[in-house]
Amino acid sequence: MESMGNNSPGPEIRALARNIRMSAHKARRVINQIRGRSYGQALMILELMPYGACYPISQLIHSAAANANHNMGLNKANLLVGRVEVNEGAVLKRIQPRAQGRGYPIQKPTCHITIVSEEISRSNDPIMSIESRKKGYVWRRK
């Protein structure tokens, strides 16, 4: 069983958005594309994706970068989108009026999105040196 503590060596920046009016399934579809990317790459990907979930997620990434800059004095260019979670929130229950006095239930789902960013440190950078990249070895972030 894994420990619940933080295993990353660098500082950790956190941003949380609660009660976002979209389903968690639709938000996870976008989140899976930006997990493990740098700050700039994540914003470029979100701008080009044709999903409505991209806007609140890009706002949250901007908020995490602002938290890093204000609270820890870190540069936005050195940030990495680390752990990202999308959890289901409360379901808003509404009634759709139908014929002959009936009403059909409508469920409007919400979700909570948490982004934990990390600073890219030069000593822990998993990308290999230029000589090894010329040989064809390229490491990928997990």
Curated annotation (Swiss-Prot):
Superkingdom as given in the UniProt entry: Eukaryota
A Pfam family annotated for this UniProt entry: Ribosomal_L22
Any GO MF annotation of the entry: structural constituent of ribosome
GO cellular component, one term: large ribosomal subunit
Alphabetized InterPro entries for the sequence: Ribosomal_uL22, Ribosomal_uL22_bac/chlpt-type, Ribosomal_uL22_bac/org-type, Ribosomal_uL22_sf
Physiological role: This protein binds specifically to 23S rRNA. The globular domain of the protein is located near the polypeptide exit tunnel on the outside of the subunit, while an extended beta-hairpin is found that lines the wall of the exit tunnel in the center of the 70S ribosome.
Quaternary structure (record): Part of the 50S ribosomal subunit.
HAMAP family listed in its UniProt record: Ribosomal_uL22_B
UniProt record similarity statement: Belongs to the universal ribosomal protein uL22 family.
Stated name of the protein: Large ribosomal subunit protein uL22c
UniProt organism field: Pinus koraiensis (Korean pine)
Lineage of the organism: Eukaryota, Viridiplantae, Streptophyta, Embryophyta, Tracheophyta
